[in-house]
Amino acid sequence: MRLYCLSGDLAKPCYIITFKGLRIMLDCGLTEQTVLNFLPLPFVQSLKWSNLPNFVPSRDHDPQMDGELKDCCGRVFVDSTPEFNLPMDKMLDFSEVDVILISNYLNMLALPYITENTGFKGKVYATEPTLQIGRFFLEELVDYIEVSPKACTARLWKEKLHLLPSPLSEAFRAKKWRTIFSLKDVQGSLSKVTIMGYDEKLDILGAFIATPVSSGYCLGSSNWVLSTAHEKICYVSGSSTLTTHPRPINQSALKHADVLIMTGLTQAPTVNPDTKLGELCMNVALTIRNNGSALIPCYPSGVVYDLFECLTQNLENAGLNNVPMFFISPVADSSLAYSNILAEWLSSAKQNKVYLPDDPFPHAFYLRNNKLKHYNHVFSEGFSKDFRQPCVVFCGHPSLRFGDAVHFIEMWGNNPNNSIIFTEPDFPYLQVLAPFQPLAMKAFYCPIDTSLNYQQANKLIKELKPNVLVIPEAYTKPHPSAPNLFIEQPDKKIITFKCGEIIRLPLKRKLDRIYITSELAQKISPKEVAAGVTFSTLTGVLQVKDKVHCIQPCADSVKDETISSNSAPTKEDVLKNVKYEYGSIDVDAVMKKLAQDGFSNIKLDRTGGALTLNLVNEDTVIKFEDNETHIICGGKPTTRLKLRDTIMKCLQSF
């Protein structure tokens, strides 16, 4: 069993586990920090950014690159549509992925890149809130970028990275960055998602039983338990032991794993989220008292629900209950409405409100009483009429490279009474503000990240008692600003990995489960050979399909001979008809034999150490690896059996 690490972003993981020829992707997070290298996309053309001087490298200048890079406040930005860093696709072809398991909606934003236009034929599994809220995130991203299109896309700068200043010179895999997917791609990728409930068991092609269990981080967030008859692997990503609005973490399901893969720890390990929430409320109140307005860049779901509740109560206690609050997002209406129909995914306190009856989230009450108003954009109908200052505005995108937040920065940036408060830890706030400098409005950094911190993670690992702990290497090194913060488990075997690495998981299976038919079971005659020890011989045909081993009765030809002779064959007669194959497969001989058996349009593909035969007409692929051969047949079962027999004829036997 191997683990592939396809992402260098610890908060947006993407891994692949290979086992018995099966390829399971764990999450498909999208690295969005790359957009910070680009100029913002305003709704209306900005004179400031339009008049920025071109950046010209000190040597090897290419005139065709003029206009792609702009110098702004001593930093170089790309003047083009923002681009994103995808999970690495060179380690393993996305078309070969059989299953994708998604732990939460923040870790699925690369899904359209993986499932669309790649030949992907696998299946995707997630909880209902993960699917629906993930849809909001994806649709919002597409809308934000498409509503402010760029005339052209800059590409030549990627050939000159060595000539560019930091941070562009350190851009990771810049040539692989991609512009945003289309809404059609979003719909196509989400149509492949199958919804699962907590603790529901899923048979993954006979290799694993996969079970999502609550992780306590956000609505519908899951940790995944992959179990077999002999092993238990737990994937812990984006988990929380704090009491907020989601259902609490299910720790019991994660105990005593053979392998525990842990990722998605907090991005703000040195701060307490409750403390930062209090600071946010205080800074908003001070801003309002100074006759200023507060801008809070946010995502369309998640922590923003808690901010609505906490901030409204705080303003009421401060005597500022008449201050209007606006939530602006292309999916604001859907997000607010959907959050109040998710009772089964909420904490007990929130669930109890549903049965009173009451709204689980107070923002439903605020909406009815006009304390909170929502709009798709600042140019939406009715916004200009309702908008008044001072006020509090929640809108995206937290990167400040696109979305309505760009408009508010331009409108409020020159007034020192106004403030911008960052709560999302995904983006370094000083880099976020770089293209807007000089900026008079106050900036506060109040990261609210409820995922596990290092102390909580160390405590959880001790309680779960895994045999082997698998974590990113960065988690074992002291944090730059807090040397005592790292994962330390002296009594545990720890395996670490980095982006781009392939590691072997220490699961050495000695046995596998085999099923037998009821007909064969009736013929078993156990004999006691020692006290409490019995055994029986068994003769049949071993069939392996979808990783499930099953022993079937002997071939029909043997039965026909039995009927015609009117007497039961002896054991020796049966064993004479059984052949035992051995040796290695000659692919060229297989191709010739397939042609003789009537198969045509056969294509041979060599990838690494594996050989693949594509039978185009039969919609079938035969994969030859070191110790196993797989027939992946999209056609009739009889075709698979015929191909199996043909391959067996190419082996030696006795």
Swiss-Prot record:
Q: Does the keyword Nucleus apply?
A: yes
Keyword terms of this UniProt record: Cytoplasm, Nucleus
One function term, GO molecular function aspect:
inositol hexakisphosphate binding
Q: Transmembrane region positions?
A: none
Gene Ontology cellular-component terms for this entry are: cytosol; INTAC complex; integrator complex; nucleus
* Subcellular location(s) per record: Nucleus; Cytoplasm, Cytosol
The residues that hold 1D-myo-inositol hexakisphosphate are: 1-2, 18-19, 504, 508-509
Q: Which Pfam families match?
A: Beta-Casp (PF10996), IntS9_C (PF21382), Lactamase_B_6 (PF16661)
Q: Which GO terms describe its biological process?
A: negative regulation of BMP signaling pathway; RNA polymerase II transcription initiation surveillance; snRNA 3'-end processing; snRNA processing
Question: InterPro entries given for it?
Answer: Beta_Casp (IPR022712), Integrator_9su (IPR027074), IntS9-like_C (IPR048660), Metallo-B-lactamas (IPR001279), RibonucZ/Hydroxyglut_hydro (IPR036866)
Residues annotated as signal peptide: none
Function (record text): Component of the integrator complex, a multiprotein complex that terminates RNA polymerase II (Pol II) transcription in the promoter-proximal region of genes. The integrator complex provides a quality checkpoint during transcription elongation by driving premature transcription termination of transcripts that are unfavorably configured for transcriptional elongation: the complex terminates transcription by (1) catalyzing dephosphorylation of the C-terminal domain (CTD) of Pol II subunit Polr2A/Rbp1 and Spt5, and (2) degrading the exiting nascent RNA transcript via endonuclease activity.
Subunit structure of this entry? Belongs to the multiprotein complex Integrator, at least composed of IntS1, IntS2, IntS3, IntS4, omd/IntS5, IntS6, defl/IntS7, IntS8, IntS9, IntS10, IntS11, IntS12, asun/IntS13, IntS14 and IntS15. The core complex associates with protein phosphatase 2A subunits mts/PP2A and Pp2A-29B, to form the Integrator-PP2A (INTAC) complex. Within the complex, interacts with IntS1 and IntS12. IntS9 is part of the RNA endonuclease subcomplex, composed of IntS4, IntS9, IntS11 and inositol hexakisphosphate (InsP6).
The Swiss-Prot or TrEMBL record describes its family as follows: Belongs to the metallo-beta-lactamase superfamily. RNA-metabolizing metallo-beta-lactamase-like family. INTS9 subfamily.
Name under which the protein is recorded: Integrator complex subunit 9
Q: What's the encoding gene here?
A: IntS9
